[in-house]
Structure formats: structure tokens, C-alpha cells
UniProtKB/Swiss-Prot annotation:
Name of the protein in its database record: Serum albumin
Propeptide stretch(es), residue numbers: 17-20
Residues the record lists as binding Ca(2+): 272, 275
Compartments in which it is found: Secreted
């Protein structure tokens, strides 16, 4: 699709009064200005995040000293001090501080080259060298020790958490890190009062880690869309999300929010984390200033402190659809002027269609709504060439209904299969399906991908029907996005490449409809294809499941054209062999004797 509709959002911004003011030139930020926006504790946190994301190997104690010095300077700047650093652009100030760290080059050999440059080249150099450092994820102390420290000095415990998360996730947005620190604070406060602290921390921290992972993956996906499909596709996706979440907002408000959110993502994705941090706070402030024009659900979030507001707004549930909103917008299919509107202001007209359809259909996935807009544009191009264009457009409604029905039925079908089989067997079904599609992908990667797909199903199929499709296709899109990023450096086949890069909105559909790899030549089964060892008798349950799935994937790779039923028969034989040999006195001797028999059965499949 020609995503020219997205230019509309910028055109409209120029034609109407700004809801949010944005300078045409980049805004130069200063320390005192930022200090005034948040309270001192949050300011310290933001400074620590910025330093830890740039200096991932630097000890906490060293960064803590820098935080104190910068905070003291910020307080003076905010009070009107004439210190030279108060008039130094924020990113320049931070990089000056970083480059002044004693023996910096001993830890970061590339820092000498970076620090010799002038901004913005210096900043770009630092961004290029920012990578997650191994072993820098937060390691929680034992509950009793943690609670004792928390009781003595809560701020220090939270600062250590911020430090570890920041250096382990150097591209995670600063407000997001602070938001997770607030949640961690709540976990400590609650669990330290519980009798079974260990279980409490384990359960709550597992949930927090999952939430952090999801936010990070979502942020990376926005950046991947921006890099691979361009700003206009990202803008279309943001318009859909905003329209679904805020159905009471006018088109003007929705498109301006979209423009702001997209610009924020551009800054964040390009690595300008300070600007990203400030713009995120400003967007939150602006949203709350105009909350009555956006959503009735916002008021509660906007009563919270600035940093907490951001997390609240991002996770806010969809507003209720206005009761007086007509279910159908006749303008797009029955208005005699429809082709004139399309011809005169194509971009604006199509953007408005996306907005109107999105706000009426929160039960549809973002990607399906983008496909619908794509189909509508195609229908207009075809019908507006005809004399009876209105009849032609009405015929297009059947195509639209079929697309919605197909996606709905697919979600229902997969949920029914998963509910019937259970997670493990459902993953095995997916494993067979995707190994046939992509036999060149490594077995561990196939197991990893299908496990995450199963987790998406487990989460989304439990939701109400109105939420299943957005959850499922949204989750699968994130998995596919990560997979396609891997495909860039490890090409698989032309069909997969086409699914990854031809169309963002059609990615999931493309992978679902992808057939077996017709270019794949299966290797011969040899004595080295399968190996069964006595550790099959002692492995923990999860590792044993992985071993079984590794066997299934390898079997599909050597016999890609047999039926699922035959794969199932061999899997049953594998299980029987394991049970027999694990009951034998000499496990390995038994496996050595049974292995050739099972291999021979595998060779005979579809022979």
C-alpha cells in the first residue's frame, strides 16, 4: 500500500491550531529547566539512568557521586545561578561530565576517540558504543537482607535497582525505568511485610521482569518499524492505537497526539535518550492538560506525580465508545462526494477513515485495521474509475466483512486447539508447522519462537472475545518482528524474506499462510542424525520437554513431507523407548540397542 495517508497527519497539523506546541527548530534543553519539571528524587533517578546507560561498567559508587554533583548544580541553576554549566546544552553537559571521569579510557578504549569529537558527532559516537553488558541484569539480594536494607535506606535500595536495570537495558526509555522502580518500591513495601517473603518476592518480581521485557520489546518493535518501513507506517500504527484507546477524541486531537507520539519515538529510537526522556514527560503533561478532550479515563492518571502518570497513561484501558456514535460511517461508502473527497484530499480522507474505523472497532487488531485501510484505498482506486462507483464500494464491504471473519475465526480456531491440547502439545503442533515453513532455522530458535507463540495464546485466549484478536495478533507481531530482525543477518528463504519486509500490516497473515519451503532438500537420515543418552532419564521436566521437541524438529527436517499423524506415531515410539530404557538396569546400553530400531522407523516414514 502507498502509505501516503500518513502525510495527512503532518498536513493537518499545519492547517489547524496546534493542540501541542512544538518548535520548528530543535529545542535546546538546560539543566535547571529539567530540574523544575520533576521532584528531586525523580531527578536523581533520571540522572542516574542517563549515566548508567552510557557508563555500563562504572561502579555504582562512582556514578552516585556524579549524581550528587549534578543534582547540586541543577538546584543552583533552577534558583538562577549564573554558573557556565547552567547555560550549557544538557547533552553537552552530560557528555562533558562523562568524558571527565578519571581513567575513562582504561575501561572504555573507544572513549578517547568519542571524547575528542564535538557534538553532535560526540553524542553519536557514544550512542554507537552503547550495548547491553553481559551479567548486568538486576540480581535481587535474599529477601531478609533486602528488607533490612530497604528498612534502613529505601532510597539507596531503589537507586541500586535503577542502576542495574539501566546498565542492563541501555536503550530502555528513562521514564520506563523510573516507572519500574516505582513498581519495585511497591513490591518491597508489600513483600517485606509478608510472612513468606521468598514466595512473595519470587511471584511479584517474575511479573515485573515480564512487564519490563514486554515494554522493551514494544519499544524495540517501534524502532524496527521506523527503520524498516518508515515513519509513515509507524505513524499509521500509532493513529490506530490512539483512535482505539480514545474513541471520544476528535480526529484533530487524535492526529496531533499521533504526531507527538511518533516524533517522540523517532528521538528515542535514534538514541537521543535525554530528549526522549524530556519529550515523554512533556507529552504526559500536555496529555493531562487536555485530558477532557482525550479520554474520560485519564483523570485518575493525571492526578499522580509526573513520572507515575506516564506508566499509568501507557497502560490505561480503552475509553468507552460514545453511545451516540453511529456504528457505520456512511461518508466512506454512500456519500456521492466520496470520490471527489478522495481525489481532492486523499491523504486526509484515508487518515480519517483509519481513525473512524479504529475508534469503532477496538475488538480488531491494529494490524487488521491497517489491512482494512489498505483494502479500502485499493477499492477506492478501482471504484472511482467507474460510473456506478457507489455500487462498487458497497461490494467492497463484503470483502471487508470476509477479512474480519477470517481473522476472527483464525483466533477462535487456534484458541480452541490450544485449550483442547494444552500448552505443550499445542507448541508441538506449532513446532511441526513452522519447521516445515522454515527448516533452515536452528532447532533451538524454532523451539524458542513457538514457545513464545504458545505463551501469547495462553495469555490472549483467556481474555474476553473483544480483546482476544488485538492481544493475539499484537503479541505475534512482536515475535515476528524479533524473528525478522534475525532474518536480516541470517537469511532463510525468499518466502520468509517476502513475509518479513513486503508489508508490516500483512506480516502475520503472510506467515500464517506460508507453505512448506519448496526449495528445501532434506538430508538423509544417518546414524549421526539422532543420539539418545541416559540423561533422558534424569533431566528436569522442562529440559526433557525441550529434548523431545528437539527430536520432533529434527524428525521434521529429515522427513518434511509426512503427515502430522505419522510424526505423532514416532513421538509415541520415542516416549515408549525412553520409558523402557529408564526402567532398564543399564540405561545407556538399552538406548544403544533401541536407537537403531527407532532410526529405521524414521527412515521408513513416507518411504
Amino acid at each position: 500500500m502507498k502509505w501516503t495517508i500518513l502525510t495527512a497527519l503532518l498536513i493537518i497539523s499545519a492547517e489547524s491550531k496546534n493542540l501541542y506546541k512544538r518548535d520548528s527548530e530543535p529545542h535546546i534543553r538546560f539543566l535547571g529547566e529539567v530540574y523544575k519539571k520533576v521532584d528531586t528524587i525523580d531527578f536523581r533517578g533520571l540522572v542516574l539512568i542517563t549515566l548508567a546507560q552510557h557508563l555500563q561498567k562504572c561502579p555504582f559508587e562512582e556514578l552516585a557521586k556524579q549524581v550528587e554533583q549534578i543534582t547540586t548544580l541543577a538546584q543552583a541553576c533552577a534558583a538562577g545561578a549564573r554558573h557556565a554549566d547552567c547555560a550549557t546544552p544538557l547533552i553537552t553537559l552530560f557528555l562533558n561530565r562523562i568524558c571527565a571521569v578519571p581513567e575513562l579510557s582504561a575501561t572504555y578504549d573507544w572513549s578517547t576517540e568519542c571524547c575528542a569529537k564535538s557534538d553532535p558527532e560526540r553524542h553519536q559516537c557514544f550512542r554507537a558504543h552503547r550495548n547491553p553488558a553481559p551479567g548486568t541484569h538486576y540480581k535481587r539480594p535474599e529477601p531478609e537482607e533486602l528488607c533490612e536494607s530497604y528498612k534502613k535506606n529505601k532510597e539507596d535500595v531503589l537507586a541500586h535497582y535503577i542502576y542495574e536495570v539501566s546498565r542492563g537495558h541501555p536503550v530502555l526509555y528513562s521514564p520506563a525505568v523510573l516507572g519500574f522502580a516505582y513498581q519495585f518500591n511497591g513490591i518491597c513495601s508489600h513483600c517485606c511485610e509478608e510472612e513468606d517473603k521468598t514466595t512473595c518476592f519470587k511471584d511479584r518480581m517474575t511479573q515485573l521482569k515480564k512487564a519490563l521485557h514486554i515494554v522493551e520489546v514494544q519499544q524495540k518493535e517501534s524502532c524496527r518499524i521506523l527503520d524498516n518501513f518508515g515513519v509513515r507506517v509507524l505513524q499509521a500504527l500509532k493513529l490506530v492505537k490512539i483512535s482505539k484507546k480514545n474513541p471520544k477524541a476528535t480526529f484533530e486531537v487524535a492526529q496531533k497526539l499521533t504526531s507527538e507520539v511518533t516524533h517522540l519515538n523517532e528521538d528515542c529510537c535514534h538514541g537521543d535518550m535525554l530528549e526522549c526522556m524530556i519529550e515523554r514527560m512533556e507529552l504526559t503533561e500536555h496529555t493531562c492538560e487536555h485530558h477532557e478532550d482525550i479520554s474520560t479515563k485519564l483523570k485518575t492518571c493525571c492526578e499522580k506525580p509526573l513520572i507515575e502518570r506516564t506508566h499509568c497513561i501507557v497502560n490505561l484501558e480503552n475509553d468507552d465508545i460514545p453511545e451516540d456514535l453511529p456504528k457505520k460511517v456512511t461518508k466512506f461508502v454512500e456519500d456521492p462526494e466520496v470520490c471527489k473527497l478522495f481525489a481532492d484530499k486523499k491523504d486526509i480522507f484515508l487518515a480519517e477513515f483509519l481513525y473512524e474505523y479504529g475508534r469503532r472497532h477496538p475488538e480488531l487488531s491494529d494490524q487488521l485495521l491497517l489491512r482494512i485501510a489498505k483494502g479500502y484505498e485499493h477499492q477506492l482506486e478501482k471504484c472511482c474509475e467507474l460510473e456506478n462507483f457507489l455500487e462498487c464500494l458497497k461490494d467492497g464491504e463484503h470483502v471487508l466483512a470476509d477479512a474480519i471473519k477470517e481473522s476472527t475465526e483464525l483466533t477462535e480456531k487456534d484458541c480452541a486447539i490450544q485449550q483442547k491440547l494444552g500448552d505443550y502439545l499445542f507448541q508441538n503442533v506449532l513446532l511441526i508447522r513452522y519447521t516445515k515453513k522454515m527448516p533452515h532455522v536452528t532447532t533451538p530458535s524454532l523451539i524458542h519462537i513457538t514457545k513464545h507463540m504458545t505463551e501469547v495464546g495462553d495469555k490472549c485466549c483467556a481474555l474476553p472475545n473483544t480483546q482476544k484478536m488485538p492481544c493475539a495478533e499484537g503479541g505475534l507481531s512482536l515475535i515476528i518482528g524479533e524473528f525478522c530482525e534475525m532474518e536480516k543477518t541470517h537469511p532463510i528463504n525468499e518466502h520468509v524474506k517476502n513475509c518479513c519486509w513486503k508489508s508490516y500490516s500483512n506480516r502475520r497473515n503472510c506467515f500464517t499462510n506460508l507453505g512448506p519451503d519448496d526449495s528445501y532438500v532434506a538430508p538423509e537420515i544417518t546414524d549421526d542424525t539422532f543420539h539418545f543418552t541416559e540423561d533422558l532419564c534424569t533431566l528436569p521436566e522442562e529440559e526433557l520437554k525441550n529434548k523431545k521437541q528437539g527430536f520432533i524438529a529434527t524428525l521434521v527436517k529429515v522427513k518434511p513431507h509426512v503427515t502430522d499423524e505419522l510424526y505423532g506415531q514416532i513421538a509415541v515410539e520415542f516416549t515408549k523407548m525412553r520409558e523402557k530404557c529408564c526402567a532398564a538396569e543399564d540405561h545407556q546400553a538399552c538406548f544403544n540397542a533401541e536407537e537403531p530400531i527407532l532410526i529405521e522407523h524414521c527412515k521408513q516414514l513416507a518411504a
